[in-house]
């Protein structure tokens, strides 16, 4: 019984599309093939280069694996683009923007899997590909199973703009066509596209009639063909316009080019080909491997570039008309010029581009935006928004690497004025915006959190020069924390800055601190050194007297008139001058008490116990402050009593949005005083304090969006703890959000306008605060330049929004909790539950663009493949490798002279081990492996016993390597043991006080693929043999036990004397280790063919289960139960559950939740962090019932059903049927985001007494790390 949840969302971009989706130019992104995000290009943000940036509009987590995104236009909404999204296993969905609800609507769903029973339909290489006719927007095509095409005809727009079919349909029925029906030669389709320059719908189809690969070049060569086919979808017939045969077998994809250039590009591994409308071609060779692998003759030879085009992306620059941007997998940039001879493209030419101070690795997609911008998505690092521009003209044009007399094409081509003007002006790229990317995460280590007593999570990210360590913390940790006062009484406190003038002196400022408990109030002040002192003690020393009223409870305090201190008590409102002289007291109406108070300018708004709002005005008479009844008032918006009030200066407009602009062109932010009042029946009043602007909204149900009150409200009373209209964001993008805090949850609404009326839509929160009626909402000072909102409590939170994210809750990492937040002199301060006042800062190097704060540290410019934590010396040890040319060697490591020395060599890896200091995050020592092409496959810090006679343990770093010599030679490797020793640091570098010392080097046949510690001994997997070795006094390793393994052990995990071994092809094996006598005891194994990527133990009390992740993106829960008949007396592991996670989990670690519960946290290739949590039986039953109701009753994004996504019965090798499914944390957290009536309906089906228990059960999902920070 387990729960699966994403702790952080995917960050690796897999698809991108620039379109007009919401009525403005948008960028649509898919991250990790699951997270759909809609951005707008913001050109009104003042930046250094006046380049646009990206702002997130909305995002959705999809219950499906996206394989393609393209845009179409439909007759019912022709001014906007709709999205055609293809999903794994031949599914497609069409969505459009709904401006009234500020969300997406599913317009059409298409499933094409019925009747397709071929086994390869579900293979990964047969995933579906979506394309659309962007030139005419009349058709879409979904390619799946390599040779089946599903066409969806879109009804064309007639001459009358208002012409719509009587049925209201916008699509004709879709149908499936086998590729061979278009032309009998077409099979094994590799890629398709719709071509642009044709009057009728025309497709370009890249296919391979005879399957082959480069290794078959002596038998089959150039087996790929390209066909241009005119398709009449309505008549269901086709005509082949032209065919081009004999293309290289390494052709990858076809890219259509817009008019007036037209035609298409075919990207091969070694060449780029341009195909015109008559199926004629021209091309450019980018390396000298092309001549070996293909007989195709190309017009231009630029083989000295030595490019590899596998994974390259191309973006055509429409503004230039004859230039495209080429980005290679290793991050090189080139401009691809189409040199014309008249209207014919005569040749292609590549010119290198030097980027301006940015790096890109493994591009996944490109999208051309407005104003010369191009978005570059990446799977292995940050995704970038760049802007192209022309540099200064070159004084002497570079010589092109032509083959023969191809320069004639350049002399007579390019007759347009623009081409002539820009030919000798190099294309350059400037960074406009950067989006955080953390994929792929390959290794995970748990280290000491230097900001608290908990742990920090360190993982490897990126590839090559973009590789880095990512330091993640489950909470926003205080940085440079300073304690200011101990044992401050009361559970509330406020800082009150005031100004006062002494006779003949310049005005001074002082900050008072007011705290209160249930009986008394206390006054302090902050001295010049930042120390808090009790006013009563300081006045005794100076023999002065303060008149602060202390024998009452204070519910609110603030500064007023810039020089007065306000104290709102239960029955009176007191105001003091800056020296705390005799106060002026204003008594509240008899029989009422103050419940809540706010200050807005010179006004004090007090919410009384009878539900009325009393407004007072502060005035100064003879330099003394006084309070009087204000002339303004608030007319009640409901017959029920007011239960919450908030007042602030806001730029929200209740009617049509303001069209005012600043001189820079950005929208003018004219703020005005606004009061928000919430009533018990759910009515919500927004009123301008000094104007007639007034808006009454219906928030009774806390539904997905709230609008003007126009009918009956939800009948259940609304329980409200606090309310705020708070600005979130930074100085560039700052927007007021409506925040409601109830006893169970936090609800955040974002404002938007529809039909010139203000509405609010609910923001989906991935976590909800724990149940606590003592929580409060507090405006906190800027955190690293961002406006945030604090949520106090035993576990406090910060509500944060960045330019690229929606508002999200991030836990505040104070272990003592925070019952109040405040600030003085721009410093962040808070009061803990223990009565300690502390101030702190926050590390600016941590990014807040994920659910967990993350810090990226680039170290050595090499790929970091492994990381481990050395606890004794408090350092991290990493394994890195770099790409080097492959040198062919024989069995004796002698170099074999190449028969083709002029051909671009293959590449291999050369590895190293390095120490990273966790305080400076720099590399302080390295060990380069001696053998050529030797790289680490595993690296672990282990504590080994020294001989059997001593109880002493020594922590060392065990490294297993492989010498990458090629598949024709037997594998070789080495086992290293390194000690981390303390040395005298270098001068002016105190962090260099650690060094690696090699203890053991054992070079043998076979690669060392996994190492770990078991009962103080070292376990190492060498080839297909597992060895357990003991460390002796002379620091040598002696084998004490062994076990034969199956194929390739990819991971080994230990728990005391128990071992879990994961095989790359044969699932897992559960093994025990005994020391008296030494022996390996095989307990049980899984007999299914599971391609294991990582595995670990999951513990709940006395229950032990195994969590296994595989390459097919599944999670398996296995159990060892010898008493179960299906286990064959314990010989087989029982499969208790199978769950499709939708991501490849590359590494995992067991993390304690409390003393008897451990969860498994994993890092994924898409840049996300996940966890699997054991769940108690009673909580599991309740949550399973809630999940079932949400799955069955609620509408799902894009119509994709969670149950069909998570459980796929077609996947082979699942073994005996699971009887306890893993709970989906994302589906469960939707309960906290449902309207109140649905929450009550679903909870009441379990029984009324379970309602509160369900909220506590959700803490299993949202607050797992309170003990870890």
Curated annotation (Swiss-Prot):
User: Which residues fall in a compositionally biased region of kind Polar residues?
Assistant: 416-425
> Where does the source fall among the domains of life?
Eukaryota
Task: Return the Acidic residues bias intervals.
Answer: 395-412
GO BP field: mRNA processing
The terms under GO molecular function for this entry are: RNA binding
Keyword RNA-binding found: yes
Instruction: Name the UniProt key words of this record, in alphabetical order.
Output: mRNA processing, Nucleus, RNA-binding
Q: Where is this region: Disordered?
A: 393-427
Q: Which InterPro entries match?
A: Beta-prop_RSE1/DDB1/CPSF1_1st (IPR018846), Cleavage/polyA-sp_fac_asu_C (IPR004871), RSE1/DDB1/CFT1/CPSF1 (IPR050358), WD40/YVTN_repeat-like_dom_sf (IPR015943)
Cellular component, GO, one term: nucleus
- Coiled-coil region list: none
Name where it's found. Answer: Nucleus
Report disulfide bridges, numbered on this chain: none
Describe its function: RNA-binding component of the cleavage and polyadenylation factor (CPF) complex, which plays a key role in polyadenylation-dependent pre-mRNA 3'-end formation and cooperates with cleavage factors including the CFIA complex and NAB4/CFIB. Involved in poly(A) site recognition. May be involved in coupling transcription termination and mRNA 3'-end formation.
Family recorded in the similarity comment:
Belongs to the CFT1 family.
What is the protein name for this chain?
Answer: Protein CFT1
Q: What is the lineage of its organism?
A: Eukaryota, Fungi, Dikarya, Ascomycota, Saccharomycotina
Provide the gene name from the record: CFT1
